[in-house]
Amino acid sequence: MDYWITRAIHHSSGCLWNNGSYIIRDVKGKPGTISNHAKGVAVDLSYRMVANTPGKSIYMGRQRSLPYIVKLLENADTLGIELCIDYAMSRSWKCDRGTWKAGNFAAGDWYHIEVNPVMAHSPELAKQAWDKVFGVIP
């Protein structure tokens, strides 16, 4: 998942940063149910502006990140994206429906993205996918 995350951040043109990926924990509010973060298939990409912090201080990050998120979801099959939660809008996108649906999520300033396990755990497959969608990084 590390390679997938690195490319996601790189291609966001600085509007997203890793707000949390691999951590051993249960799903919030569901004791005993392991989180997809703990399985190494989820990342939270934030657009929050953190003053005077390189890589975390882009102006209008949400507005700038939305077209990028749309592009990722348009290429979800290639990139292995299964789920995207947009906490600011309390909505989720799932690969089996291919559209946004209102949800009941706590407010937040990040996107939670889950990737299929095969893609998440294969840097080579992730590289091929990102190269196909965005081109090879020299």
What are the roles of these predicted feature ranges?
Residues 1-32, 83-95:
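Extended, low-complexity, intrinsically disordered C-terminal regulatory tails
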Residues 1-5, 42, 69:
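A general structural signal for well-ordered alpha-helical packing
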Residues 13, 19, 28-31, 39, ...:
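Feature targets compositionally biased, intrinsically disordered low-complexity regions
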Residues 26-60:
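Short, conserved helix/loop micro-motifs enriched in His/Cys and acidic residues
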Residues 49-138:
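Catalytic cores and adjacent binding grooves of peptidoglycan-active enzymes
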